[in-house]
Amino acid sequence: MHKLLPTLLFLLVTLALRAQQKVIPLYPGAAPGSENWTWSETESDKNIYHSNAIFNISKPTLTVYLPDSSHAPTGMAVIVCPGGGFHSLSIMQEGYGVVGWLQSKGITAFLLKYRLMHIRGTDPYQQENEDRTRKAADTERAVVADMAIADGRQALAYVRTHAADYGIDPKRIGIIGFSAGGVISLATAYEATPENRPDFIGFVYGGMTPATIQAPVPADAPPLFIAAASDDQYDLQLMAVKVYTKWVTAKRVAEMHIYAKGGHGFGLRKQQLPSDSWTDRFLEFLTQQGLLKN
């Protein structure tokens, strides 16, 4: 029983924090392009991995997590994009855990629930596995990925427009994404406007859309932090190297950490591996760039 106590405590704290947060719809009405989506957002751990996941998001939102009272606010904000293959959100280690960690550092965090592919049953992971061999799923995923990227841009615009409401410096607003969420965070650097341009990007074992792969790095591309593991099951460490090469070739600021072990989806999971320390490296990077000011 004592081995379960840390997990139970984490879940209780998470539930308490979630009950206190402000949830903001990203669009005043139905999100553009998904006006006819009728399915309801669901959060459940009843899946093949017994892992808490959110799926069937048709109404994208931002949830605000203000800095902990134990730490002076830094005036910086980070939008957090969990991964999940555009089928679900891996909400614990790449969502709730990440925003809680940022709060503890005096950073205002915004959890982005972006639009996802329609899950026809009750297990998003099972459908994701089945969709790997379903050709129509590739087309659907590409369409939804573009919608999710639009949600990321909309989230950045919201935070910058309302920066004063949250005590945020409008020049220190960034975005971090994990896996599919990294597709979103990286893409926001492209075709950005003054309202939705991120001031920094976290790209953690992320991917790229074909359009992002082909596009030149913008002349004003923000500082980029990259983390991945060499034993990533989806070989996204190779994507990390490609993104890093594109950034430095364009003479833009980038820092990359490729860990020998860690696998895909390490997030905030502690494995007694060097990849556990990526969070420290990320904060150091932000400090060196003059973005994180204690």
Give residue ranges: language-model regions.
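Short amphipathic alpha-helix adjacent to the substrate-entry channel of hydrolases
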Residues: 91-110
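Primarily recognizes the serine-hydrolase "nucleophile elbow" in alpha/beta-hydrolase
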Residues: 144-220
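Alpha/beta-hydrolase active-site loop
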Residues: 124-164, 278-281
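N-terminal cap/lid segment of alpha/beta-hydrolase-fold proteins
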Residues: 20-71
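The feature captures the conserved acid-bearing segment of alpha/beta-hydrolase catalytic domains
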Residues: 199-258
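C-terminal catalytic histidine-bearing segment of alpha/beta-hydrolase fold enzymes
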Residues: 248-294
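Bacterial Sec-dependent N-terminal signal peptides
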Residues: 1-22
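Short beta-strand element of the alpha/beta-hydrolase
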Residues: 74-83
